[in-house]
């Protein structure tokens, strides 16, 4: 661009990371994650809208909540909570998350109660493997260990 005569203007900047190479950029990015976390059975005990324990009346899986919140406060994750709870339970769910002190960026409701598969691309700028999955036993407080 410079050789073709394009004009450039300087801008005063602060608080930026100059990686310089693709390798350095990829190393820097590895600090950051986007976590898709299922609510029931991982952050609170499993619930139902058909029978007890009902949605909104679950017990907190506090060790898992603490592990997730620590990542949230470190500022290097985006937390997207997912659930099979129907959309009509959004207000109850958001209130439950607030009551239990669960931090998050987004909530996706209404997933089918079925197998979940994450499909992601990879490239030089997002090397293989670019995605991972953790399957954990329902209602167990072992998220911190599984996240490594």
Would you name each region that the model predicts?
Residues 30-148:
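HAD-like aspartate-dependent phosphatase fold
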């Amino acid at each position: 661009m410079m050789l073709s005569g394009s004009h450039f203007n300087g801008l005063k900047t602060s608080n930026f990371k100059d990686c310089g190479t693709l390798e350095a950029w990829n190393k820097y990015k590895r600090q950051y994650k986007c976590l898709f976390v299922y609510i029931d059975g991982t952050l609170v005990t499993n619930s139902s809208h058909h029978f007890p324990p009902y949605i909104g009346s679950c017990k907190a899986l506090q060790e898992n909540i603490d592990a997730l919140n620590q990542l949230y406060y470190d500022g290097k994750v985006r937390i997207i909570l997912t659930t099979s709870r129907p959309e009509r339970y959004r207000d109850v769910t958001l209130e439950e998350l607030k009551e239990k002190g669960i931090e998050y960026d987004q909530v996706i409701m209404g997933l089918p109660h079925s197998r979940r598969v994450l499909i992601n691309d990879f490239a030089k700028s997002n090397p293989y493997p670019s995605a991972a999955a953790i399957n954990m036993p329902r209602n167990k407080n072992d998220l911190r260990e599984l996240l490594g």
